[in-house]
Structures are given as C-alpha cells and as structure tokens.
Amino acid sequence: MLTAQQILSSKKCGDLFSSADKQVVIAEYREIARAYHPDISSDPQANEVMAKVNQLYEEALKLIESGAWEVSNRLILRDKLGKKYIGKYLKQFPFELGEAYIANSTVTYVFKENHKRFFDNAASQIKGLRYANKKMEEEMSRFMPRILYALSLDDGRFCLVLNKPEDVFLLSDIKDFFGGSLPDRHVAWIMSRLSNLCCYFSYTGIAHNGLTLQNCFICPSKHSILPLGGWWYAQRIGEKMLGVPSAVYDIMPIKAKSEKLSDIITDLESTKLIGRQLSDISSLPKPFQSFLYSCS
C-alpha cells in the first residue's frame, strides 16, 4: 500500500496503479479507498489523498479505453523508421546540448536538433577508441563508454544510449551525497584514476575536452572512474575544437583558448578542477593543495 505522501506525489496514472489492466486498476482503487476514504480514515490528509486518487482513477480509465498509459520517469523515443525505444530512468538533467537520462544500466543523451555535429562526433570518437594490445584493451575498455544505440529521432533530435554498469554513479551526485566535499582519501584515488585516463587519452592522440563532475561516473566499490559523458567535445590533439563546457573553458590554457586547438593540457587542468570541486581544500595536505592549484 502506498503512503499518503507517495500518492500525493504521483503525477501519472502508472505511478499509482501497477497495471494498465482495467480490473487491476479497479481493484487497486478500491483497496486505496478502503484505507484513505475520509469517512473511515483518520489520516489528516485523507481528503487530499482521495481527491488525488479519484483524479488519477478517472484518467486511468480513459487512458485504458484509448489504449494509452502514462508512467513518470519513462522515456519514449521513436526513430525515423518509427521504431519505439521505451525505458524507465532514475534521473533526468539538462546538459549544454540537450537532456540526459540515467537509468540502472544505461545513460541516454538526447541532443537538440541543431547539435548533429556534436552527436556525430561523440559516436565517431567512441567508436574510434584504440588500444596498444589486448592487455591494454582489457584494462581500459571497461572504463570507456559502449554505444548501445545511436539514433536519429523522428522529431529531429539525436540520441546516444550508452551502457552503464549498475554500480556506478554520477560524480556530481556523489559530491552532493557527501554534502559538497568528499573525504581526502576519496579525492586522492579519484585524482589518481583521472590522471590515468589522461595518460590513456594522450596515448590515443585525443583530448576529451569534457571532463566535468556531470560527465564522469564513479564506482566507489572498485575505485574506478568512467568518463561516459562529454565525448561530443573530444578531438584529436592539435585539431580544431568543437567546443568545451563552460567550466572547462574557464580553466583552459591560454594557448588552447586563443588557438582553439585540442590539447591534452585541457584535460589535465580539468582533472585538477574536479579535485578542487570535490575537496575541502583546507583539510588537504599542503603538497596536494599545491598540486591542485599548479599549472600543468
């Protein structure tokens, strides 16, 4: 049985009723009414709850008749051939080129209509990742994004659906969970893993150009970093940049900023910015503080 607060926070019929089957909806409606009807319930929110239940119940019956159904946090995409892609997500947030959706095992980036070149670049850069040998591939590929779908949508937008292990979390969410700053020992291993990623990017001849709290995911149990987002900015070192997030632009080397050429130094400076954003700087050892504020 849902709590009063859960019922009041329901936005779609599928948030309240477990099925689009009419008999199930009727049975669940009666069960809720037995618990929250103002004539028999002592809950102070009973009137408000039943008003919400009645509203969603009426909407549910209409949707069932029309063959439709609604559930919150459900992403429905349709490609240009008419094929539907449906999935539930845990978190939605905007990024500079569109909307992102995080689910248990995927992260989906939906690009606005006018950002096709960024969508194309992300797909190309991810597919073009290379490794010196099998050992390097086994070590590094588990941290790199893997494309499940790259879609041109029927509404003119573009969509990348990437694989995401279930035990990884957005780095900005981890920061929020810790109240704005992580314990020093966690910042230390995060910086170590980010530095390893920069070494790999340098080997492959690219700069990621989008390493931020919103584009990096971490697996706390395995002490690993996965740069799943931001690949739309990646570019061969020395080639013309497509752009960078505003936070990265603020700390870019002057040369890279003026020449607008991709440079691994941008990634190195981005990792230090992440370290500063995650830290209570005053609690860090002096050498670590000096490193985070040094120039690469």
What do these predicted regions represent?
Residues M1-I40, K52-E65:
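N-terminal J-domain/J-like co-chaperone modules of DnaJ/Hsp40 proteins
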Residues S66-K88:
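Juxta-kinase regulatory segment immediately upstream of eukaryotic protein kinase catalytic domains
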Residues Q92-R146:
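ATP-binding glycine-rich loop module of kinase domains
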Residues M144-R185:
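Conserved structural core of kinase catalytic domains
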Residues I190-M191:
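Activation segment signature within eukaryotic-like protein kinase domains
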Residues C198-P220, L228:
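Catalytic-loop of the protein kinase fold
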Residues S224-S296:
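C-lobe/activation-segment region of protein kinase-like
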